[in-house]
Structures are given as structure tokens and as C-alpha cells.
Amino acid sequence: MENFVLYEEIGRGSRTVVYKGRRKGTINFVAILCTEKCKRPEITNWVRLTHEIKHKNIVTFHEWYETSNHLWLVVELCTGGSLETVIAQDENLPEDVVREFGVDLVTGLHHLHRLGILFCDLSPGKILLEGPGTLKFSNFCLAKVAGESLEEFFALVAAEEGGGDSGENALKKSMKTRVRGSLIYAAPEIVKGTEFSVTSDLWSLGCLLYEMFSGKPPFFSETVSELVEKILYEDPLPPIPKDSSFPKASSDFLNLLDGLLQKDPQKRFSWEGVLQHPFWKDALRGEDSGWASEDSPFSRNVMECSGPHDSRELLQSPKNGQAKGQKAAHRLSQSFRLENPTELRPKSIMGGQLNESIFLLSSRPTPRTSAMVELNPGEGEDPSSPQKTSPLSKMTSGHLSQGALESQMRELIYTDSDLVITPIIDNPKIMKQPAIKFDPKILHLPAYSVEKLLVLKDQDWNDFLQQVCSQIDSSEKSTGALRAKLNLLCYLCVVATHKEVATRLLHSPLFQLLIQHLRIAPNWDIRSKVARVVGMLALHTTELQENVPVIEAITLLTELIRENFRSGKLKQCLLPTLGQLLYLVATQEEKNQHSRDCWAVPLAAYTVLMRCLREGEERVVNHMAAKIIENVCTTFSAQAQGFTTGEIGPVLWHLFRHSTVDALRITAISALCRITRQSPTAFQNVIEKVGLNAVISSLASAICKVQQYMLTLFTAMLSCGIHLQRLIQEKDFVSTVIRLLDSPSTPIRAKAFLVLLYILIHNRDMLLLSCQARLVMYIERDSRKTSPGKEQQSGNEYLARCLDLLIQHMVQEPPRILGDILNALANVSGRKHPSTVQGKQLKMCLPMMPVVLHLVMSQVFRPQVVTEEFLFSYGTILSHIKSIDLGETNIDGAIGIVASEEFIKVTLSAFEAVIQYPVLLADYRSTVMDYILPPLVSLVQSQNVEWRLFSLRLLSETTTLLVSQEPEDGDEEASCDSDSSLLALIRDELLPQYEHILMEPDPVPAYALKLLVAMTEHNPAFTRLVEESKLVPLIFEVILEHQESILGNTMQSVIALLNNLVAYKDSNMQLLYEQGLVGHVCNMFTETATLCLDRDNKTNTEPASTLLASLLDILLGMLTYTSRIVRQALQVQKSGSRGDTQAAEDLLLLSKPLTDLISLLIPLLPSEDPEISEVSSKCLSILVQLYGGENPESLSPENMVTFANLLMTKEDPKDQKLLLRILKRMVTSNERLLESLKNTGSLLQALERLAPAHRLRGPWAGISCALFQQRAAAQGIPELPPYGIPCCGPSHKRVTGVKLYPC
């Protein structure tokens, strides 16, 4: 079976993911749909209808597979998106484009109908665009053969999958909902419930043409009933393009749409009318003639078909399964009918093993967030358009199975950087060679350049070769001849560096001649140069034919090395050539994918190379031998297998550990890494010989490449299970790997993540150690570097893939950890003395709770970890903790008191981390209220002070978050139920404890009051509960206890609570007044206002301003309440009723101390905070209305300056009038204040400037009247009001002291 490489995700539905893929070993790209098995009927239907269709306008089916968890459908890749996307982006298309697209639609649909296939659910989302713009039909999930029942087919496939048909009728019923397509494009007869037909498909075709031109379908509505009404009874409006610059529809196009959208199928266009329509301008002439030559048998016979066929016949009998009564039955491909339902089966893995390893994840990055497409039947499946998104689709959290995870991990063990190839010959890191030069003067043949050699004609090339061979084969032994021969060999070394020249020389008679001279050359100078030429040819050639005597050369070189093994210089000359020839043969054999006898390397060659590796050899010889093994073992070939001996691993390790040259150490460990890729036992032998600790210590090497290769070796070992149990239990190993995450090298960090993933898969306990060693921090750091949208640097793609797999695995761990903890706690629930086995289970499970804490504190893991299941499990654990706190369960004896308290503390801390992000709780509001808050309320009553405080804080903050969240549309009823449950919980369980809670030291009262604040804000009726629970006296006791710290959290909370109590319209204000509300408010207001007005102390200004705003609201509420009571009393008095005004007078007397705040309210009027300024003015206005100028300090010099400045700076006439009314009330009710006003020049000047603007009306009239009277009395002038304005205006009532009487 061929494998496929998966690239980026290009689509996603509720049960399907679409990838761009490639068939391994080719450059053929495809679309690969990975679908859950519950969609087998739809996918089977798609396959049976299209597996033999080859048409330019239909997406080609390639093959399908079944693995353990999924169905995989491989189809043609369309890169242009869907027609739906095109319409959405362009809004509407010109008529010429509609015609061009329409030709493709008609051609494809016509071909399907000729084959007897009805598409049934034609919509823009199921039409894909190939790159050049060709439209193709896709997603045949709901298509069918004319006349058959799709429900029966689906039920039959599902029954066969289930192993029988005992429930076939039930299956048929359940399938009815699965075969419904999009109603928007359905024909009227389909809406009425009749079967699909050719004419119903043509109606859908008309809808598509209409939508392409106008940008919207002919019939559309938000409600199904209204849409059905339109389809059945309304005529479509003429299509109008959204872009007004586009020309209107032509008469031919309107005529075509009218013919296709006829509600009566008998009047609707047939194929003949469609194909011959003038709108197409002869573009469908070929289709038209093809249809005419067939005499339209299918169209007639389908409409004459008496009824649906039995799908069992269609599946089981190719004869009976064909449409009854159809004369053109031979046109219905027999591939649509199956003699046996098991005939049409997806391919499975060889050997019957169902796994997903045939689909390999490519090295390209997969986007973390992909656009989702709804792939359910009827929604339109779009394998190549990531833009198509269904509003109903939901993200599915598909976790990889362990087999699939490890399959992807194995693909990541070796990267390109692990398998880099560098030359063996002329490698400067091994040995620096002098540059090769030749003298053209003594060459005795044309010194052709490489460029010239490439363009030589065959005859010239042959002549050139003949001259070269003749000169090399010359038997002359003079010094000049030898020098000329050496010069020629140098020339050949130079030209052999070009690939094409090297390939031609290698396959020429010259190569055989060079081999001969290796054997018979008169001196070693010639032999070394010949060997160098052969090595250069082997290095640069691009192919190797079987007739080239390369094995002969290898054998000869092996013999020469063996015969002269004591000569280090000769080995340095011959080993590079031997290595290049071995690598050449290995690469060619790997390319051909099978072993060839003509390339069988003699065993002596391997023996010689092994001897060159051993201790005692020269460093250069060791390096060359290691380099040969490194290069050859990069390939999967028989030549590489020749090195897989028991001693190769320890020999390379010894070379690595004892060499003093870094380049040699890197080559040795690289060779070991690559030979371990061939045979993992090579590294296993090393560990067994030198010990695991010695090998682990090598990870601390200062050489990055060494660290990289060591990590690769350990990953390979872990992947095949060798020494698995030892490695996953070795804490030093884990700690060393985690320290490598600080490396600046991206590949090292990626491989460290991969090693840790292998460890964590097999030993969950190491997750705790890893988290304590800051693994989560490292993951967050590298996740930011590899996040989508950032420019990807080299190696970041590989890092992202390793990181993604690690994150996927770690996300699955919290549910397992919580499940284990729940099982352990459930086993000891209610037991005072757990058994030894139960205690051991507790010791294993409870210490893992910090892992959950680490993950929920991480922005990478938190959104994936906090689910409804997580919160439910967490709430259940809290219930067990409640049982432990009440003494019903005892775990202290099993795990110790310290461990028990630590477990509870970490558990509470985990939820504290969750509530820092309120958005996570929005979707699970009911779960939190039902399962988490009740045990928290119980823990508030705990005897353990720390748990009690912690639980109260969590309860307070959680409740504040939950009650402040608005329920989503449709969730109002559930939200109401949750609120009722919360209210009952707090009323029955918590409020009775408040008398004790509020008297505890800080910060307990602050959290308790914060909860009351949240509840009274969210549900004002909760105020009644506060009063009924007799908490009001306790609230004022809290004020007395904490009044010295006015800015503390407790005072802030109590002031906010008082604000809510006063603001509630049905609040029992009398109760508040009886508890000393007025005095407390005066004291708190005075202290807070003083802090706000203190310009020298800016530290407390901001918190004091916030607190002052709340106190102003309280004061305003109190004054408003008093004003309402007084107004009611005056109305009773005015009406002549004998109503009692004593209550109002008592309230006025009780509230009179509030007049002392006037001198503080006036300086607050110019506040920069508009809220403080506005509320202060309202409070001041009501105070002077109630008490007039009772406060002699009201118009102190400082306050009058404030009034003067405000009158001159306020531009809004309403603000000026309010200030004037306040002044008028003060000066007309208190002569002392009037005298003070007369003696203050700045305020008088301000009033005089405002006089013309107000023309002596309203409040200005009252002030001027008072001033005039006082001046007249001083000068003996009769008391006549200026300009004839009455002194006090209309008759009104005035309050002085505590009596109510007329003015």
C-alpha cells in the first residue's frame, strides 16, 4: 500500500477534517478527507457513485482506506475554493462569467444524468474550482441512482457494518434525517415530499445560475416555514446584480431562468431545452448533439419510473438492481450495484493491522487554527475551501490515539539536519589537502575547460577520451612521462568536479583504465593520483549504471589498504576513494529500492574499515573511517546493513569519548546516530557496555551537535522500547533533558520536547517532576515563538510540530489525573482508617494534583484543559474534601497530615487560577453553580482557618463573576434556575454563619462582604434576605471595628454593600437609621473627602476617590429618601388632612447632622471627576432645600470663592441655575449668610456679571431681592423689591429646625 504525506489542514467539519496531501514518492497532490466511521453510509455512497467516473467537471475519486478510528477518502485536490466562496467574495458575477461557469455546471450535471445519477443536493458549497477556473462537482454523499431509496441504502450499509439487519426498519427511520439536503435549492415537488428527479436537479441548477448573477438565491428566509411558502407559491424576482455598475440580465438569461424555475415540473425545461438554449451561444453544441443522438432515453424513463427501488436489490443484484422499466438501463453503471455489501470496502493496512501510519505528517507546519467547514450531509462538503464556515459548526477536540501519536513521533526522530552529508574526499575537517593544479603546457592534449567539454560533439569527445586513455596507458617510464601523467591526472581531478563531466567519465572506458592503473602503477604517486580521480568521479557523478566496474574498484582498494595497512599515508590516500565508492553504490541502490547482486560489497571492505576505527590508529584514519560509516549509513541499503555488527556501537562510542578533536567526536557520534537508525541495537550495545549513567552524562556536552545527536539516539531508543523502563524512571535523565530546553539551538529544544513526550507517555509520574522543573514555562516560551502569524525561522517548523504533539498529550493528562484521584478518594470515602492498598493508591494519585495546577495556570493549556468534564470532576473532588473536613473521611493516617493539607491547598489554588479568566466560566455557568459552589460553601464553615479563608475568597470571587455574566440567548431559563439555586444555597447554608464570619479578623469580613455586594447588585431582592438574617447590625459593627482603616478592603466592601442597601427601593431605611446610618456616613464621608481634598498626599487620592463616589451615592440615596418623606408630609398638610407629620419631622431631626457635610460638598463641586462633581451638586441641592442655611460655615470665604469660580467657569446654563438656586436658598433662609455674601467681592462680581444673562429671573431674582432689601434697610429706603419682582416669589413651604410652616 502506498503512503500519503499530510500537509496543512484545509477544512474541518463536525466529524471530518480535510488535509492537503501528497502520495509518497510522487509529486501528485490530493485532498484527503479524514472522517469518523459514523459517516460510513455517506462516504460509501460517494465512493460507489464516483469510483469509475472520469470527467473534467467532476472531482475524481482516487481511493479510500479504513483505519482503526477513521475512514480516509483520497480525491482530486481543487485549489480554487468553492463556488460559494467566490460568490461571497465577489457578491455577484457578470453575465459572461455566469455563462462560462454555467457551461461547466451543465456539462457536469448532464454527464451525471446520462450515467443515471441524480445529484439531489446541488448547492454552491458542493461546487469546487480548479486552479484555471474549471468548476467540478464534489461531495456525492446525498446523490443517488435514479429511482432508488437513499434511506434504504444508508440503512443497509449501517446494518451490514453492525453485523446484521435485525434493526433494519429502525435504521431506515433514523436515516431519514441524514438524507435531507439544503432546502434553499430544493424544487417545489421535493418540498412536497416527492422523489428527486432530473427536473428537480435542473431546478437547483437554475437556483445556482440565479445566485451567481444576483449574489443571493431566488428564495431565502430566516424561517423554514416562510422559505417553504416562498418556494411553493411565490415567483422569484428578476435577478438584479448587487453592483449597480453591472449591466442588467439579458432577455436570454431571464428566459433560461424562467424555464428552469417553473414550479410545475412538467412545464420546466428538459435537458433538450437547456442544451439548445440561445443563452449558451453554441458553447454546448457538443453536449446537445450527444444528448440528441441518444434520443433522451434516460430523461424520459426516469420520469416514467413507477417508484423507488429496493436498495437491497441495488446492492445485491446487478440485474434486478437496475431501474425497472428503463430502456436505457445499460447506461447505469453496474458499479453502482453490489452483489454483496462487503464488495465495496475501503482498503486496510497490510496484514490486517488497522492503524493510521500510512498517512504521515509532513515537515511543513500545520496551522494551529484552521478555518472550519461543515461537512455534514446537506451542509456542503468542500475539501479545498478553508473559507467555508458554517455558523452551526463547533470545534471538535479530536485527541490522537496513542498509536497515532507515536506514529507521528517516529516521523520526527530524524530530521534533515541529523542526516546532512559532507564529502569524504577533500574534506577540510578531516585533512586539509593542497589545491589541485595542472600545467596545460605539458598536458599533451587540449586543455578543455568544463564548459568546452560539455559541448563537445560525440566524435570530439571520443577523440578526447582516446587521447586521455592513451597518455595514461603509456608505458614510458621517463621522469618527463611520469610528470606528464601526473599532470594529466591533476587535470582530470579538476574537470571531474562537474557533475555531468564526472558522470560521462565514470561511464567511459577511462574508469576501467584507472582501476587497472591502481593495480599496476609503477609508483605510489601515480596510484594516489589515480585513486583521487576515482574518488572525485564517485563524489560528483549523478548516476551509476550496472556495467560500471565499481565493485571491482572497491575490492582493489580494499586489497591495497589491507596489504599496506601499516602505512598511514597510503590509508589516508585510499580510504576517501573507497568511502566515496561505497556511498555511491549505497545511494544508487536506495534510489532503485532493491538490492542488486552486481553491487554486493565484499566483506573484506567492512573488515578493513572496522580496523581503521580501532584505538591506536592515526586520528585522520579514524576520522575517515567514521565519516565513511556516517555517510553510508544515512541510506537504507544493503551496504549500510554491512556495518551493523555488535562491535560498531562501542567502537564509535570509544572514538567519541576519547578523541580530543571536536570534528572527529561529532563525526563519531553522528555515525553512531545513523547506524542506530539502521539498527537500534548499536546504541543498546553502547549502554550495556559503558553504563546508562555514562551515556546520560554526555548530554551535558558543550557541543550543540553532540547534544542534538545524543537526543536523537535517546529518542530512537525510547521509540523502539529498548531500555524504556530504565530511562523513564531515571530522574537525572529527565532533569538533564529539561535543562537542554535552555539551549539556544532550536533543533535541540525540539528534540528535548520529543524525548520528554516519550517519557511522559510511558510514565505519567514524571510529569510532576517536569512541571516542577519549569517545563510549562518552556512550552509557553516556544509556543509564542512558533505561533501563527510570526515569521517562521529555520527550525521553528520542526519545533512547532514536536511542541504540538507534546501539548496534545499533556492536555489529555488532567482528566486522567482527576479520574485517578476521584477513584482513590471514592474508595476511602466514609472510612476513618483506609487499608494499606487504599493508602498506597492515595499516595500515588494525590501528589499529581500540582500538575493540574501548573496546566491551568498556563495560557497554552488552560483553554483546552478547563472543560465541563474538568469542572465536574473538580467539584466532585471538592465534595470529597468537604467530607475530609467534616471528619467523615480520614486520609491523614494514609498519606500524612502535611500531604493531606498540601493536596487541599493545591486543589483550591487550581480553581483560583481558573477564575482569573472569567471567559472560561461563561460556557459552564450551571456546572460551576451546581457542582463547585456547594462544597465551597461547606468549606467556609471549616475549622481549619486557612481552608476557611481560601474557600470564602474563592466563593466570593466566583459568585461575583457568575452573577455579573449576562446569559446567552436561549439560556435565560437555565440561568434563572441557576440563580435560584445559588440564592437558596447562600440563604440556607451561608447566611446563618455570617454572624461568626463578619466578626473574624481581616481579611475574612472583606471577602464575606464582597459576596453580599455581588448578590445585592445582581438580585436586589437579596437585600430582604440580608435584613431578615439580622445582618444589618453586624454590618455597622464591622464599620466600628474597621473605621480606622477607611481605605481598607473591608471598609470598601461594607460601603459598597451600604450603597446597595440604600439604593434598593424597598429597603428598610428605618432599620438603617436606627443603627446609626447618619453618624457613620458623616464620619466616613468626612474622612474620605478630607483625603481626596488633600493635595499633598497623592498616594491615597485614587482609592479615596473611588470610595468617595460610593459614599456620595449613599448620601444621595439618604437625602432622596428624606426628601420624599418630607414631600409626602407637606402634601398631607396642604390637603388639610389630619395626617401625622411627626415621622417626617423626626427624620429631619435625625438627618440634621448631614448639614455638616455642606462645607465638604462645596469644595467637591469643581472636582475633575464628573461623577463626583455631579452627585455632589445634587446632594448639596437637596440639603439646602431641606435645611436651608442651617450650616453657618456654608458660605465661608473659601466656599464663596469656589462658588464664584464655578459661576464664571460653568458654561452650561443648567449648571449655573443649579448653583444660583443653592445660593438663593442659603441667603434667603439665613441673614448671616446674606451678610457674608455682601462682604465677599468676588462672588458679588460673579453675580453681577451673570445678571444681564439671566435678566433677573428665577434664582437670580431671589438673590437680588435679598440684597436689595438689606441695602434699603441700611439707607432708610422703603422696602420695595427692584423692578417690581415679588420678594419670595410664589408661596412655598420652608423647613426651619424641625417644624413645617408656610413662608
UniProtKB/Swiss-Prot annotation:
Start-end of each HEAT repeat: 504-543, 727-765, 796-834, 926-964, 1025-1063, 1105-1143, 1151-1189
Location of the region described as Disordered in the Swiss-Prot/TrEMBL record: 304-332, 369-401
Domain called Protein kinase: residue spans: 4-280
Active site, per annotation: D121
CDD domains in the record: STKc_ULK4
Gene Ontology terms: cellular component: cilium; extracellular region
InterPro entries referenced in this protein's UniProt entry, alphabetically: ARM-like, ARM-type_fold, HEAT_ULK4_RUNKEL, Kinase-like_dom_sf, Prot_kinase_dom, ULK4
Catalytic activity: L-seryl-[protein] + ATP = O-phospho-L-seryl-[protein] + ADP + H(+); L-threonyl-[protein] + ATP = O-phospho-L-threonyl-[protein] + ADP + H(+)
Keywords: ATP-binding, Kinase, Nucleotide-binding, Repeat, Serine/threonine-protein kinase, Transferase
Polar residues bias (residue ranges): 384-400
Domain of life: Eukaryota
One GO biological process term: ventricular system development
Enzyme class: transferase
EC numbers on record: 2.7.11.1
Signal peptide coordinates: none
Tissue expr: Expressed in embryonic and adult brain. In the brain, widely expressed, with highest levels in layers II/III and V of the cortex, piriform cortex, CA1-3 of hippocampus, dentate gyrus, ependymal cells lining the ventricles and choroid plexus, and in the thalamic reticular nucleus (at protein level).
GO molecular function: ATP binding; protein serine kinase activity; protein serine/threonine kinase activity
Protein family membership: Belongs to the protein kinase superfamily. Ser/Thr protein kinase family. APG1/unc-51/ULK1 subfamily.
Function: May be involved in the remodeling of cytoskeletal components, such as alpha-tubulin, and in this way regulates neurite branching and elongation, as well as cell motility.
PANTHER family in the record: SER/THR PROTEIN KINASE ULK4 (PTHR46240), SERINE_THREONINE-PROTEIN KINASE ULK4 (PTHR46240:SF1)
Protein's UniProt name: Serine/threonine-protein kinase ULK4
Organism: Mus musculus
Lineage: Eukaryota, Metazoa, Chordata, Craniata, Vertebrata
